[in-house]
Amino acid sequence: YMIDEAKKRGLDDTFAREAIYKYGEDIGKEMYNDMKDPTDMVEFSKHFGTGHHTDIYEMETVASDEEKLYIDFHYCPYVAEWIKQGRNPEEMATLCEIAMEGDRAIGETFDAFKFTLGKTIAQGHDVCQIRFDKKK
C-alpha cells in the first residue's frame, strides 16, 4: 500500500527502491564483514539464504560450488499477499522488482560475484530464481 499512497501524492517508486536497496546494503556489509574471505562463493553460501528464510520462502539450493550459488524460492509471501490485495500481473512484477532491490544490493556488496534474478513467482512462474555467479 505504501506505493499506492505515494502515487496519490505524486511520488514515483524511486524512494522505495532506494530504501530497500539501502537495507540490502546493510545486510550485505554485515555478511561481508562476517566472512573470512568475501571472494569465496562456498563461504558466501553459508551466509546467504540461511536461517528461517529457508522455510519461509521454501528455498531449494539447486547449485552450490566455488563458482556459483543458485537458489530457487518455491513460495513468496509477498506475492501471496499481493494476490489477496487483487494486484494485477503487471503490478506484481513491478512490486517484485522493487522488493528485489535488497538482494541486488547484497550482490553488489561483493565485487567477486554477479547477482542475477531469473524467473519470478510474481511473473507467474513456479519459482523465483536467485543466482550468484563468480565473476571471471
Region roles according to the model:
Residues Y1-E97, F113-K136:
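N-terminal accessory segment detector
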Residues T94-G107:
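A conserved amphipathic terminal alpha-helix motif
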